[in-house]
Amino acid sequence: MNTFWKTIAEYNSATWMYQIFIVLIGVFLTLMLLRNPQRWVKIGMKIYFISTYTWISVVYYHIYCSERSYNNVLSIFWAIMAIAWLWDLLAGYTQLERNPKYNVLGYLLVLMPFIYPVFSMARGLSFPGITSPVMPCSVVTFTIGLLLLFSRKSNLFIILLLCHWSLIGLSKTYFFKIPEDFLLASASVPALYLFFKEYYLTDLHKDTKPKAKFINWLLIAVCVGIGIVLTTTLVIELYKDA
């Protein structure tokens, strides 16, 4: 647990200026997407996701979380999601078309990166040892929220990877005493339901790239592989604490 919060403090201390820059770009693109969703804005948002996910993979996990026993597998996981967004950018599948049906949950999740540090400070924590807006769970909640606001024809593979990640957060609430992740895990359940509801109500399962059966097998392979590795590393961490 000490290593977990120590790496977070080191990450925040060294990168807080970069995090502010990343957040400002995200705020700008989100406002532009809501007010004037032109093609260049949509492309810019996808590039932003690719860049931010790569940042989490390389800077957060590979560099600053190198002391953690499971950093490499999570770095790979985020690299996979960055590649998935790159594929989506090139294929043009996710349309980022506005869908006002899920505004309440969507806006709540989009604002969650700012709620995370407030929640940490409410627990008596102080900077730099707090959750920040450019950390994995904050980025995931923001992405899920944005995709809910623009849920017409979304990339199901990316959505399921995001929801899979949010469930991983449940384990961290116990092992690393980080109840902030309950916010992510609890919000992902209704979000996943709404995504599938939209998916089948609009018959998107008939127009999926890659094809539905390939998405299914790919998702199963990725989730099983990551699940096995994470379960093993979490058991190791529990054994160390015993």
What positions do the PLM features span?
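Alpha-helical transmembrane segments and their membrane-interface exit regions
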Residues: 50-56, 76-85, 141-145, 166-169, ...
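Juxtamembrane boundary at the C-terminal end of a transmembrane helix
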Residues: 231-242
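Loop-to-transmembrane alpha-helix initiation sites
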Residues: 70-74, 174-190
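Membrane-interfacial loop-to-transmembrane alpha-helix junctions, especially the N-terminal start
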Residues: 38-50, 98-106, 150-162
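Membrane-interfacial, low-structure loops and terminal tails that flank and connect transmembrane helices
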Residues: 200-217
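Aromatic-anchored segments of alpha-helical transmembrane domains
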Residues: 51-59, 109-119, 162-174, 227-233
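N-terminal topogenic module of multi-pass integral membrane proteins
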Residues: 1-66, 242
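Membrane-proximal helix-loop-helix units in multi-pass membrane proteins
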Residues: 68-145, 150-151
